[in-house]
Regions:
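Residue-centric detector for conserved, function-critical "anchor" positions
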Residues: 1-53
Length: 53
């Protein structure tokens, strides 16, 4: 499944603001940890613009 950059950014923010562990939040969202951390690394390296495919 492909996610638009805006949705990836929203997911990164949800995980960051959650009081739950990242794994649990991602499980509830149905997002694989590997996928999330790939997005997160891209976000850290290049900001929101780096999330565009």
């Amino acid at each position: 499944m492909s996610y638009p950059a805006s949705e990836k950014l929203a997911i990164i923010r949800i995980v960051g603001q959650s009081h739950l562990p990242a794994k649990r939040t991602l499980d509830q969202l149905g997002i694989a940890r590997r996928t999330f951390y790939r997005w997160y690394d891209r976000y850290l390296d290049g900001g929101p613009e780096a999330l565009a495919d």
